């Protein structure tokens, strides 16, 4: 999936402690880690925006190992519940984590350790299953979204296309790697041979922007709350000469805040993209082209390349007229395989067959741009 040899001389990662890793470095380190695993397994990963977590993710995806992506600060009771339900073969966790001292440590690399957790599984994992991500609404629940290799490649390619991501990009991490939007930033930049600036620092911290400017970052991504914070900080006064692109997803941004960042982008020769997606679609469903932002304020835009959107009424009939509200049905190769609640569900194949009922209600305007107005049973227009 990630062609580390093709981009071997490119800088892949810069950490906020100023460590620099090329794609060749990543290739060599992930090969070392893989030697300790040796086959298709399930691995629970406690993620943070550090080189160890990223290295593990690259190794697992590139070697047909399935990672369960979890935040490193997950509640221990919830973690134990998930481990009991999914029975992962290994854990890939920060070296300082001391919850699993009774288990064998197979290797330590880049501040992370590989723990042999459970070698008794006889359940076959579906051969197209690549990744398990929690859903936005499943905090406290064992529900994961089952994502395939095709899902990742399809969505990654579409995002690279509409954001015009090239090898020269340097994206700084704002969002958690265990969150579909945060992970999509990593996927797109690794896939094209670009650079990821890894930091766990908050976007409102002075050190975050010092790091961004020192290494000439070109983009950042955020949810509406991120942009509300930046606006309160008087972002327009911040000097970020290397910044090219800002992206937003993860919920509806207020019109005032979107106008603030649109005007900033226009006046400073940058671009700003508002996007819509769900974990069940691997990340992205639609985007609003920058040139339409002033005319189509509040819209989620148009479908990503390779995908299509239909609106259907209560009878599941397709809506063909403007301004009529219906549920968004998305179709594309990035639609996930389905859900999992436990280890045995990892045997399941593609239950969605490329069709996702999003539960979001929306309408078209006369130009076929889409405007969300709520969730099912709560839409007022």
Residue ranges, per PLM feature:
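Conserved ATP-binding/catalytic segment of the ANL
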Residues: 320-323, 327-381
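ATP-dependent adenylate-forming carboxylate-activation enzymes
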Residues: 47-48, 68-83, 194-215, 226, ...
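Conserved AMP-binding A3 loop
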Residues: 22-23, 130-157
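Conserved AMP-binding/adenylate-forming core of the ANL superfamily
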Residues: 9-37, 50, 77-80, 147-150
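Conserved AMP-binding/adenylate-forming
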Residues: 32-73, 174
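Conserved pre-ATP/AMP-binding loop-to-beta segment of ANL
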Residues: 6-8, 114-134, 141, 164-170
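Conserved AMP-binding/adenylation subdomain of ANL enzymes
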Residues: 153-170, 180-219, 304-306
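Gly/Ser/Thr-rich phosphate-binding loop
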Residues: 217-222, 231-295, 308
């Amino acid at each position: 999936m990630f062609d580390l040899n093709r981009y071997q001389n490119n800088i892949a990662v810069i950490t906020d402690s100023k460590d620099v890793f090329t794609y060749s470095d990543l290739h060599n380190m992930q090969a070392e880690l893989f030697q300790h695993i040796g086959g298709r397994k399930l691995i629970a990963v406690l993620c943070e925006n550090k080189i160890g977590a990223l290295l593990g993710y690259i190794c697992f995806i590139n070697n047909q190992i399935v990672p369960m992506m979890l935040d490193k600060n997950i509640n221990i009771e919830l973690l134990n519940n998930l481990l009991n339900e999914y029975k992962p073969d290994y854990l890939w966790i920060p070296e300082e984590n001391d919850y699993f001292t009774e288990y064998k440590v197979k290797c330590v690399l880049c501040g992370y350790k590989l723990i042999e957790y459970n070698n008794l599984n006889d359940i076959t994992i579906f051969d197209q299953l690549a990744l398990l991500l929690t859903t936005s609404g499943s905090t406290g629940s064992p529900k994961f979204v089952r994502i395939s290799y095709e899902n990742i490649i399809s969505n990654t390619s579409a995002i690279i296309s509409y954001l015009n991501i090239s090898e020269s990009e340097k994206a700084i991490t704002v969002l958690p790697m265990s969150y579909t939007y945060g992970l999509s930033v990593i996927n797109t930049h690794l896939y094209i041979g670009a650079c990821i600036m890894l930091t766990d620092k908050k976007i409102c911290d002075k050190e975050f922007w010092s790091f961004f400017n020192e290494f000439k970052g070109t983009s950042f991504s955020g949810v509406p709350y991120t942009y509300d914070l930046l606006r309160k900080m008087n972002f327009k006064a911040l000097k970020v000469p290397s910044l090219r692109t800002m992206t937003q997803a993860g919920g509806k941004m207020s019109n005032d805040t979107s106008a603030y960042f649109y005007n900033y982008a226009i006046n400073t020769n940058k671009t700003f993209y508002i996007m819509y997606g769900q974990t069940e679609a691997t990340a992205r469903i639609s985007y609003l082209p920058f040139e339409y932002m002033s005319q189509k304020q509040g819209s989620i835009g148009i479908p990503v390349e390779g995908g299509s959107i239909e609106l259907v009424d209560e009878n599941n009939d397709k809506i063909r007229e403007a301004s009529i509200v219906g549920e968004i049905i998305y179709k594309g190769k990035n639609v996930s395989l389905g859900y999992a609640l436990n280890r045995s569900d990892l045997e399941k194949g593609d239950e969605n067959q490329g069709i996702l009922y999003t539960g979001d209600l929306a309408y078209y305007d006369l130009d076929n741009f889409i405007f969300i107005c709520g969730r099912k049973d709560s839409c007022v227009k």
